[in-house]
């Protein structure tokens, strides 16, 4: 299809700058049975709580089984756009723009770091650290391409880590990403010697296997808070899933 959503004929001539759109098909797309929860919806934004194993947007083997596709159908709104993303294995809150006219001012919340995000994670104890603990490091693409790694150099990632519950074998941590690098929280916890429970990527890449609903990654995008750029009122949202759910 062209930019006017008209079908292109096989004989259509080449034109410099022509934009072409296509619908990607996936054979045997995995079905994600878990269901998302809409936490809030208004004329400008939608806040949804994503289950484990559901991608936010189409990627790889997933086209229809994504949070974006599900919400666009639910609200009959093709203009829905996620303002940030969380990993497929992570559960929790995702903020969407529902109105193109106001999208930019909500995107600015992330660009200008005016939004506060907190995660909960279950991982082995770190009795040797004093909390809250700030971990800074330089993250770069690793091997294979979808993993990240810490390396020597000027830090480009920062996470504030605190403890909210102490058990015998695991602790529950509150993680605040000051920056938003890919897999940042997972890499930082693994680097400290406390990889997040059931992490298939860190510290070592596990063999590929089907998703196990009994062993989801114990990482949850727990809260989102910001001053609404339209009304100026404080907004705060809490996930409907967590370590005890």
Q: What function would you assign to each model-found segment?
A:
Residues 1-245:
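RNA pseudouridine synthases
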């Amino acid at each position: 299809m062209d930019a006017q959503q008209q079908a292109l004929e096989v004989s259509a001539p080449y034109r410099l700058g022509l934009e072409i759109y296509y619908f990607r098909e996936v054979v045997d797309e995995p079905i994600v049975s878990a269901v998302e929860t809409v936490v809030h919806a208004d004329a400008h934004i939608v806040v949804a709580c994503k289950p484990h194993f559901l991608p936010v947007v189409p990627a790889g083997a997933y086209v229809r089984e994504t949070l974006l596709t599900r919400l666009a159908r639910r609200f009959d709104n093709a203009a829905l756009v996620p303002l940030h993303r969380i990993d497929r294995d992570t559960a929790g809150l995702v903020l969407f723009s529902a109105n193109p006219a106001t999208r930019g001012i909500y995107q600015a919340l992330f660009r200008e770091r005016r939004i506060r995000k907190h995660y909960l994670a279950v991982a082995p104890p770190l009795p040797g650290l004093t909390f809250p603990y700030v971990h800074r490091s330089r993250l770069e693409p690793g091997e294979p391409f979808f993993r990240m790694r810490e390396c020597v150099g000027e830090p480009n990632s920062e996470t504030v880590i605190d403890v909210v519950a102490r058990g015998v074998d695991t602790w529950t941590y509150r993680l605040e990403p000051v920056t938003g690098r890919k897999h940042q929280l997972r890499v930082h916890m693994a680097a400290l010697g406390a990889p997040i429970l059931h992490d298939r990527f860190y510290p070592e890449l596990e063999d590929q296997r089907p998703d196990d609903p009994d062993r989801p990654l114990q990482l949850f995008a727990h809260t989102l808070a910001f001053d609404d750029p339209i009304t100026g009122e404080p907004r705060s949202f809490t996930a409907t899933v967590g370590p005890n759910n």
